[in-house]
Design a protein with these regions (language model features):
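Catalytic beta/alpha-barrel core
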Residues: 54-59, 75-85, 104-110
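Histidine-anchored nucleotide/phosphate-binding helix
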Residues: 67-70, 86-87, 119
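Active-site environment of divalent metal-dependent phosphoester hydrolases
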Residues: 60-64, 83-90, 137-139
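His/Asp/Glu-enriched, well-ordered alpha-helical/loop segment
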Residues: 52, 91-94, 103-106, 111-192, ...
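Structural recognition of the beta-strand scaffold that forms the well-ordered cores
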Residues: 52-56, 66, 79-81, 99-102, ...
């Protein structure tokens, strides 16, 4: 179905191009443009490599279908949500530079019922990962808890941090503005009382655009602006 939709969008683009060429040559004899189709116009953004493609998928065969579509139609960037069987094709995903957004299930089970820490497995096989909650399946405030689960079962804390900061920023093309602490980027940050991935810790300071908007009562009596 996806491939058919992409082919129809390509045909729509060709019809638009023919109309524009005819209109330039002789406006009086140009045929009517094709009826406007907003769905096809949305897919043109993909064909013209103006937006990335994010696909919800789980099974390995469907994952590889998505990879083939990306190669056939020249997607600018492909990312996969959930992708619970991505460990079966991790090497292929790494080779094609596909990002996997892991969650809400952080631990999956292989065909022999062995636990697989999906985020860690993919990272060790060279796949760029992000971690999500899939809100409202897991509520958004529990994002760091999702990352903590991956850490508990083997993912390096530094990679878990990247998976909820700079990696997703890069995935949506905003890495020059957000995702890490660097001069010139948005100064939005939280200072925690300890390890970010220890759920017993609390936020001490919250800064938005460099302005402190929250201070815990544990710090100088606390302040909210």
């Amino acid at each position: 179905l996806v491939r058919q939709a992409m082919l129809e969008a390509a045909d729509y683009r060709a019809a638009l191009d023919r109309y524009e060429n005819e209109k330039k040559k002789n406006p009086a004899t140009a045929t009517a443009p094709p009826p406007r189709d907003l769905k096809k116009e949305a897919l043109l953004l993909v064909l013209e490599r103006k937006i990335p493609v994010h696909i919800h998928v789980d099974q390995a065969d469907d994952i590889m279908t998505a990879v083939r579509l990306a190669k056939e139609f020249g997607f600018s960037k492909l990312s996969l949500a959930h992708a619970e069987e991505s460990y079966k094709v991790a090497d292929e995903l790494a080779r094609e530079k596909v990002t996997v957004v892991v969650g809400p299930r952080m631990i999956v089970y292989d065909d022999d019922n062995r636990a697989v820490n999906l985020a860690d497995y993919l990272h060790r096989h060279g796949v760029e990962i992000c971690i999500m909650t899939d809100a409202d399946v897991v509520q958004q405030p529990f994002l760091r808890s999702q990352a903590a689960i991956a850490i508990k079962y083997g993912l390096e804390p530094a990679e878990a941090l990247r998976a909820i900061t700079v990696n997703p920023a890069r995935l949506i093309g905003l890495e020059k503005r957000i995702g890490s602490l660097e001069p010139g980027k948005d100064a939005d940050l939280v200072v925690w009382s300890g390890d970010l991935f220890d759920v017993r810790q609390e936020a001490l300071h919250v800064f938005i655009d460099g302005v402190e908007i929250y201070r815990s009562a544990r710090v100088d009596g606390g302040v909210k602006k």
